[in-house]
């Protein structure tokens, strides 16, 4: 087993322990607690795969971190913080849109890559726009907060959201989830369009001229994927 893999796991275990202490002392917010639960499940899975005990790994991780901190200067810390890119947040939806409750007449749900896809299969022949709130790092979608599908009159007919109890998701997970959602809605002859932010940061597409939300190749891939699932 690669020593760097073991060391990385040990440090992750110890840092999770520190975050857990903050949570136990009510020194963190709800998103922090959500990430803590997701990361706990991920660490258990990694520990099982690597055949490492979590308690032992945590203690070893503490030693590694302490050794690093002994040689760390305040100046080095300032340089590291200044050079680290910070994610920025994109908000297609207002607070009202992202928090509004909605209901499905013919519900369909699917879990993919740590994301829950929900859609109302009773919706037919509608023009639908996808909007999302998410963080961006290095000009690419990093973490999805919520994606919802709206009809022209503002009704919510579908949604993609992270599952708190599961590990985090990747950009590819988000793309796949959007593909499932688009395919499911287009199955009932709905016309789907993604916001410019989704196009740009999920697929790297700029759509200033009002073109289709996805390139033909991506559309064909999604259609094939969904046909096998619907």
From Swiss-Prot:
Recorded GO MF terms: protein serine/threonine kinase inhibitor activity; RNA binding
Motif range (Nuclear localization signal): 34-38
Sequence segments annotated as region (PABPN1-binding): 223-230
Notes concerning its domains: The dsRNA-binding region is required for suppression of RNA silencing.
Family, similarity comment: Belongs to the influenza A viruses NS1 family.
Known role: Inhibits post-transcriptional processing of cellular pre-mRNA, by binding and inhibiting two cellular proteins that are required for the 3'-end processing of cellular pre-mRNAs: the 30 kDa cleavage and polyadenylation specificity factor/CPSF4 and the poly(A)-binding protein 2/PABPN1. In turn, unprocessed 3' end pre-mRNAs accumulate in the host nucleus and are no longer exported to the cytoplasm. Cellular protein synthesis is thereby shut off very early after virus infection.
Subunit field text: Homodimer. Interacts with host TRIM25 (via coiled coil); this interaction specifically inhibits TRIM25 multimerization and TRIM25-mediated RIGI CARD ubiquitination. Interacts with human EIF2AK2/PKR, CPSF4, IVNS1ABP and PABPN1.
Protein name in UniProt: Non-structural protein 1
Species this chain originates from: Influenza A virus (strain A/Mallard/Alberta/88/1976 H3N8)
């Amino acid at each position: 087993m690669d020593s760097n893999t073991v060391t990385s796991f040990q440090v992750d275990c110890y840092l999770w322990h520190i975050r857990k202490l903050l949570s136990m002392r009510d020194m963190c917010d709800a998103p922090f607690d959500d990430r803590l639960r997701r990361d706990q499940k991920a660490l258990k899975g990694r520990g099982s795969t690597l055949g490492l005990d979590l308690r032992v790994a945590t203690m070893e991780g503490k030693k590694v971190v302490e050794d690093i901190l002994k040689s760390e200067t305040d100046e080095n810390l300032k340089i590291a913080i200044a050079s680290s890119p910070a994610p920025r947040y994109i908000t297609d939806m207002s607070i009202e849109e992202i928090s509004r409750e909605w209901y499905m007449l013919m519900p369909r749900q699917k879990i993919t890559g740590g994301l829950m896809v929900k859609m109302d299969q009773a919706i037919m022949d509608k023009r639908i726009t996808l909007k999302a709130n998410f963080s961006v790092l290095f000009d690419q979608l990093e973490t999805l907060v919520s994606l919802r599908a709206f009809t022209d009159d503002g009704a919510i007919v579908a949604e993609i959201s992270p599952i708190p109890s599961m590990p985090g998701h990747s950009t590819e997970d988000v793309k796949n989830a959007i593909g499932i959602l688009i395919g499911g809605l287009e199955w009932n002859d709905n016309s789907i369009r993604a916001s410019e932010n989704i196009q740009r940061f999920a697929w790297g597409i700029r759509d200033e001229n009002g073109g289709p939300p996805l390139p033909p190749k991506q559309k064909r891939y999604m259609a094939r994927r969904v046909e096998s699932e619907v």
